[in-house]
Structure formats: structure tokens, C-alpha cells
């Protein structure tokens, strides 16, 4: 990060999520006078990566689903379950990872967050609640068929049924209605023409 600030230049690899490793040639970037770099990831708020940076050289954001969706009878879907649904939808499309594999990895994801993100979230300059109240209506159209494909003998069958039943409480909305510049596109992918 110090090199980026001092030289305005940096290189990044392309990460192949299917293979689980970087591949190909590094892409080189040179910043213009008005450009900025967004560093995203599990260690983005960790002070070990920012304590040596000049004061005022970075702005820290913590972006996460911060609220549940409730009905008159109580919680319909928790922030954690909504994040899991997002991940299932994203992983199948962009990481070639099955819903069952995503469910298997989820406890480790949460453990990593507890260790590497949550302790530092209060160091953020800004917190963004990334929930879209209509999100379950959109996600259900993609997620429910994926969840239904999980076999009854799977250790993740019960969780899949629970997520399905929660999503079924929402009216479906076609994902083509989600704007192209919406943060939900990170999970849904681009608008299909």
C-alpha cells in the first residue's frame, strides 16, 4: 500500500476461484491524479495493513448486511442467512462452486470473519448497510432451485430446506429489474439481455 501511495503504480494477479489460486500474467496499473484504489477483502480493515500509511491517505469502509427482515410474527430472514444466500448465488455463477460446497465452507467463512473482520469493524470510518429490502424477492428465484438440488441424505439438507422456507415467504421479483449498477449485481451477475 505504501508503494501504491508513493509511486501510484501497482500490479495485481487474476484469481481463479475454480482452481483456488492466482493465474496468468500480472495486470499493471498506473493511477492518475484523481484516481483511487479500493482494497477489498477479509483483511481490508486490519490495522497491520494500514498503520504505516500516511494520515488521511485512506478511508475505511465496513460493508455488510446489518439488519434482519421481520414480519409481524418475528424474524423472516437473518442478516447471516441473507449473506449465505448471496454467497450461494454468487459462488455457483462466479466460482463454479456448488451450493452444497458453499454450505460446507460457510462455518469456516464465519470463523474467518470472527477472527479477521469483526474485531476491526469499529475502526472503519464509515459503515454501509448493504441490505436491499427487496433482495430476498430477487434472490429466491435463483436460490430456491439451487437449494432444492441438495439431496435429502446431505448433511446440508436441513439448512437448505430452512433457507428455502424463508425465501418462499417473499414474492418473487425478476432479477432483470435490478439496476446494472446495484451492489446486488456482485451476486446475481450482469443484466441478461
Model-derived features with residue positions:
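Conserved nucleotide-sensing/catalytic segment adjacent to the nucleotide-binding pocket
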Residues: 1-23, 36
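Short, flexible loop segments at the rims of nucleotide/cofactor-binding pockets, characterized by
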Residues: 14-21, 40, 103-108
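Cytochrome P450 C-terminal beta-domain/meander region
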Residues: 26-29
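Short loop/turn elements that form and flank the Walker-type P-loop nucleotide-binding site
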Residues: 31-33, 55-56
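A generic hydrophobic-helix recognition signal that picks specific residues
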Residues: 33-34, 118
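Structural recognition of the conserved hydrophobic beta-strand(s) that form the central parallel beta-sheet
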Residues: 36-40, 61-62
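Short beta->alpha connector loops
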Residues: 42-45
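Conserved NTP phosphate-binding and transfer environment spanning the P-loop NTPase/kinase superfamily
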Residues: 47-193
Amino acid at each position: 500500500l505504501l508503494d501504491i501511495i508513493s509511486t501510484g503504480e501497482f500490479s495485481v494477479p487474476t484469481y481463479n476461484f475454480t482452481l483456488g489460486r492466482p493465474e496468468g500474467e500480472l495486470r499493471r496499473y498506473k493511477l492518475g491524479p484523481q484516481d483511487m484504489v479500493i482494497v477489498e477483502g477479509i483483511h481490508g480493515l486490519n490495522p497491520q495493513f494500514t498503520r504505516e500509511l500516511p494520515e488521511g491517505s485512506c478511508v475505511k469502509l465496513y460493508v455488510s448486511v446489518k439488519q434482519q427482515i421481520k414480519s409481524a410474527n418475528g424474524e423472516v430472514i437473518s442478516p447471516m442467512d441473507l449473506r449465505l444466500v448471496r454467497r450461494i448465488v454468487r459462488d455457483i455463477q462466479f466460482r463454479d462452486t456448488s451450493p452444497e460446497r458453499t454450505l460446507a465452507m460457510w462455518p469456516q467463512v464465519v470463523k474467518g470473519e470472527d477472527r479477521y473482520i469483526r474485531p476491526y469493524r469499529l475502526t472503519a470510518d464509515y459503515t454501509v448497510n448493504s441490505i436491499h429490502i427487496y433482495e430476498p424477492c430477487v434472490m429466491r428465484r435463483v436460490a430456491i432451485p439451487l437449494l432444492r438440488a441438495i439431496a435429502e441424505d446431505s448433511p446440508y439438507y436441513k439448512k437448505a430446506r430452512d433457507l428455502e422456507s424463508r425465501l418462499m415467504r417473499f414474492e418473487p421479483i425478476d432479477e432483470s429489474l435490478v439496476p446494472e449498477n446495484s451492489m446486488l449485481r456482485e451476486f446475481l451477475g450482469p443484466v441478461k439481455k
